[in-house]
UniProtKB/Swiss-Prot annotation:
The keyword Membrane does not apply. It comes from Campylobacter jejuni subsp. jejuni serotype O:2 (strain ATCC 700819 / NCTC 11168). The gene is rplY. HAMAP family: Ribosomal_bL25_CTC. GO terms for biological process: translation. It comes from the Bacteria. The keyword rRNA-binding applies. This is Large ribosomal subunit protein bL25. NCBIfam families: bL25_bact_ctc, PRK05618.1-4. Part of the 50S ribosomal subunit; part of the 5S rRNA/L5/L18/L25 subcomplex. Contacts the 5S rRNA. Binds to the 5S rRNA independently of L5 and L18. Keywords: Ribonucleoprotein, Ribosomal protein, RNA-binding, rRNA-binding.
Amino acid sequence: MLEGIVRESIGRKAAKALKRDGYLIANIYGKGLENINAAFKVNEFIKEVRKKTTLIFDVKVGSQTLSVVVVDYQKDPVTAELKHVDLKVAQKGVISKYMVPVKITGTAIGLKNKGVLIQSKRRLKVKCAAENLPNFFELDVSKLDVGDALLVRDIVVPAGVTMIDADRVAVVGVEKAR
């Protein structure tokens, strides 16, 4: 489990001091909960995020243990180091919005016919309770030929999950190479 500290002082000076000591600044929030300003060791946070098997993982901040989902993060444009992360508390029974990654499987037929596979959506917006949250959407592109596309409406959605993205939006497609 990832352990962090609660930041008492908020501001640029305090954040810079924590970053200098190897901490990652984080905000933790959720519906009906008070926001928590936290900090995690950067290397520990990266290890924990890489080894997790689900979108939801546990963190301990101060005396609280919370199940959270990574909502957003900021990286340094030059060094690509993590600078900041936003975490949303995944509460059981509370319907909330999440971003779920898309995994593509198979090799499209259109690639052999001088086509190019284009993935226009890497994450899809869904609305569901934390216990119904899928880890990813798996799309099989093996039947796609040049000019074909898989739309949001073509994705099989588990029970209790609602898609927020429009039905007509293309997720992945094969286009003719120029």
